[in-house]
Amino acid sequence: MPTLNMEKKNFIFKDLELKNTLVVPIIRSNMTDTATTRTQWDGTVTPANGETEDNLFNESHDWQFELRNKFNLKYTLGRHTFNLNDQFVFSDYRPKDDRMNEYLGFDPSSFPSKMTSNNIGLSYLFASSNNRFQNSLTISIYYLKSKIYRTSDALSKDKTESVFAPKQTNVNKTYYGFSEGLSYELWKGVRGKISFSHNVRIPDTGELFGNGMSIKPSVNLQPEVGDNLNIGVIMDKRNLLGLTRVQWETNFYYMYMKNMIRLFPADIRSIYINLGKTSTLGFDTDLKVDITPNVYAYFNLTLQDIRDRQKWLNDEKGSDNPTYDKHVPNIPSFYYNYGMEYHVEGLLGKTELSRVYVDVSHVGEFDWGWQMSTLPDQRKKWIIPSNDVFTIGLQQSFWHNNVSLSFEVENIFDKENYMEFKMPLQGRTFKAKLRFNLFRDKVSGGAMSM
């Protein structure tokens, strides 16, 4: 993936910092499904057109070209900091499947989907002379232009010609956002904070275009627009109770969102759609402890209640919404993870780094569909059971930290676990990763960092 980074201090004039990152992903995805038979669970072999449930042959060779650019200008004047940030994305998705011509009646490669988005924000940060009081104000403008051809939907005839063509959806809108945050150091190393924001999240290309297989292109997908309130406490103490360093952050938050983007079933596939109105009331806490300079432990936990707040099926008071005030499915309400690692420098060489770690994650049970019944048998049908995943691993650097080698065993007890939509997670899994720092870039921390 071609990437170009550029950084410059004192750009144009003193104290003006420039950072720019340009990434050009080029993605080729292929799916070949030409199976003529299907084997059932009991061993019975039946005729089929492909293995997927839509009973259609697939031989796709899709291309996706993207251009992503992040631009940032930062200027500091005494206790005042000004920051201009721009994030631009252009994506061109070109599906191609010759077998589709046989049952769709058109060549999907003639109908590329495109998306252009831009997010520009200007922020102002003020810090008092002793940094005890800090204030941050940001104003943002968001732009989204998308043209999506729903090549997996039913065909519609062109109004001007007697030919079949895929349905098309267009979005061309501009949005605004802002955020205001205050923090104050209550005691040395302990800071309280409060923030309010009106944010917009532009859908990404995977949500808009689908994946050409199990996820369909989205229909009139709109950006998420949310109002957020956050109140929290941050602590950062060194040499506390004999510990090298203790970092702790906890937050209480409330979010009211319009057009929340979620993945839902659509016929035999899935599609990203907008939920009209939702609310989130939550709490999270994150604890990091350097027990000694070489031993590190952590724990984080999240509790959240996300509910549908669309009382009517449309903006006019007509039909009641049957899912009103119910939990939004496929989002866990309770999860946590904790772990510990031992890291050391110089064990296998003067500048080499070594790490051994263990990680445990827990996700409480949650529903994978709207819970419409109070009957125990029906509720059990839609519940994804809680799961625990234990992971151990080690990492070692070589060649003056320009090469790192890591091994990891995930789900070491080989437990049966499920994710969203009750899709099974992998059992015991062995992973290995080799990383190179070919240009010996010290700014990135080498091939491995603590």
Where are these regions (language model features)?
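Membrane-embedded beta-barrel scaffold of Gram-negative outer-membrane proteins
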Residues: E185, G192-S197, P223-L281, T302, ...
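Outer-membrane beta-barrel translocator domains and adjoining extracellular loop/strand segments
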Residues: M1, N30-A48, R94-Y103, K147-S156, ...
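Extracellular loop and loop/strand-boundary signature of outer-membrane beta-barrel proteins
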Residues: M1, N5, T52-S60, N101-P112, ...
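Face-selective signature of the C-terminal outer-membrane beta-barrel domain
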Residues: M1-E161, T174-G177, S183-W187, S195-S197, ...
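Outer-membrane beta-barrel channels and translocator barrels
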Residues: K9-F13, T76-H80, S117, A127-F133, ...
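Conserved C-terminal beta-signal and adjacent last beta-strands/turns
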Residues: S123-L125, E180-E185, I194, E224-N230, ...
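Transmembrane beta-strands of outer-membrane beta-barrel pores
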Residues: V24-N30, L77-R79, F88-R94, F126-N130, ...
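Gram-negative outer-membrane beta-barrel transporters
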Residues: R79, Q247-Y256, I273-W368
